[in-house]
Amino acid sequence: MHWNEKEQTFCDATIDEYEESVHVCHKGYISIFPFLTGMLGPDSPRLKAVLDLIHDPQELWSDYGIRSLSKKDKFYDTDENYWRSPIWININYLVLKNLYVSAFPSFDLFARGI
């Protein structure tokens, strides 16, 4: 996992068809794991970007919970979509738990608004 400055999100590392390590950005649960695990504190300069990703209805936000993959991603809701759009209750619990934690003190109004 790494921070991608251009995408303003945490991205993944994978092995490509040539068995070389490459960085890939598919905004989804992987992008919010540092927030979900408490590794991204309330004073982190990256917290606002993560909260924006969670709260954007064109990305992860939905009427029913946080999507596992961004609605904008080319793989969203395609083929075998086990990780490509469904909403997972355990991840949504962690989002709520960490929104509560991050609401104090620095992102009080923004985090509470989500």
PLM features: residue spans?
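Extended glycan-interaction surfaces of carbohydrate-active proteins
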Residues: 1-87
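Well-ordered alpha-helical scaffold segments within catalytic/enzyme domains
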Residues: 33-43, 93-108
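Beta-strand segments within the central parallel beta-sheet cores of soluble alpha/beta enzyme folds
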Residues: 109-114
